[in-house]
Amino acid sequence: MKEFKIKDICEVISGGTPSTKINSYWNGDIIWLTPKDLSSNKNKRIYNSEETITEEGLTHSSAQMLPINAVLLSSRAPIGYLALAGKELCTNQGFKSMICNTDYVLPEYLYYLLQTKVEELNNISTGSTFKELSGSLLKNFKVSIHDLDFQQHIVDIRRKSA
């Protein structure tokens, strides 16, 4: 087992929101998640969102397309909702998403690992009215990672028990 900062094993990406004043940015074909979508998601993977955006909306916002298996973490209101992207999608700024370097960590393993770290993530978050987990705090958050074979073993066990 070896300790890593998240930034050493993942690319951390923040989300964004297109202007709500421009109708042509909304109701497109691109899944656009908010923490509310994860609050009602009872599965490990998420495939749909309440709201969608257009390609134009994506282009004119700080939202970025995330690949299948990106680890999605709500970073405010509340901190700690987790899911894996079941298809390409993007998120609002209430997320910090992680694209895993699979030479070090399997996305599904990181998903399970972070489920055990929600309290720690809340404890390091800042803010007076609403706590928020910044990109910098998440990037520097340390996790202990097993070798890939053991990670796969854990994932297999979790899949069988689900």
Q: PLM ranges: what are they?
A:
Residues 27-29, 91-92:
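Short acidic/glycine-enriched loop/turn segments that link adjacent beta-strands
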